[in-house]
Amino acid sequence: MKSLTKLLLLLPVAIPWQVTAQQRYFAEKSVVSFFSDGVVEDISATNSKVTSIFDAHDGEVAYLLSIKDFQFVNKLMQVHFNEKYMDTEKFPKSSFQGQITGFNLNSTGKQQVKAKGKLTMHGVTHDIDVPGTVEVVDNRLALKSKFIIKLSDYDIKIPQIVWQNIAQQVEVTVDFMYRPL
């Protein structure tokens, strides 16, 4: 009887913790890529070492990436990107911290969501509000988003000699696969 009483007293405390724990997700080796439609040539790169955490209970989401992990087809572009444009020695990371709205863990199929929060890049932080989708796939969550950022918003300067080669706006694609924690 004492065991049953203890169990019943602990149950209200244990169940919310278990539910909350099941609603936290972690993504590693996820992908952020970008594409710049230049007049002379297109520029694109992919970072497949991005880590992210998502709490499906309250919608909190955050990701962190290392700028040096962006891979280019042309290695010289990668060197210029890190040294001349992104100043990776001074600003080695980019991050996002915010909230995803419009997501229901119990729904099936792709759900249209919004991510609203603070994107930090090149030492500058701006509020962003971007569309995306979340889909529950085999107890994992697939989050995808595509949005445009202006380089000038993040104080990324393009030298006058190559400004025609590089678009002032860059398309960013996010592709995360979360697993339960």
Place the predicted regions along the sequence by residue.
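Bacterial Sec-dependent N-terminal signal peptides
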Residues: M1-R24
